[in-house]
Amino acid sequence: MDRGCGTTPIYKGGTLPEWATINAPSFLPYVIATPEIAMGYLFTYPLAAGLNANTKILWYVATPRGGYALEAVGHPLGAKSPTASFSKAADSGPGEIYPTGPTVPSAGCWHFILVWQNGAQHADVDLLFKS
């Protein structure tokens, strides 16, 4: 669908991992993290930059959450600052999902590290935010 940014393309359609199909909004564009153990459905596309932006990504993870939150920290690709972060408790279902509303202070390609299972699992994803 779109080349996305960094190493993370944006897809629409195609074959989804089985763990990411439970009540999935498969009609939406999505990103797949590296390694392929997390993916996010983009309810807001394109993602908007700005601290008051209304964004929504529904993350699916391939491994049990174990009751632990999803934690994410990001920065513009190729820079160490500014930073942005979000977290979501493991309180949604069905399936291994985390609905989030990430915000970033400026437009561009942002690299996030997603962490869950109390740090046992992690994946990288690049997300394009537009002004």
Predicted regions and their residues:
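Contiguous segments within soluble domain cores/interaction surfaces
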Residues: 1-105, 109-131
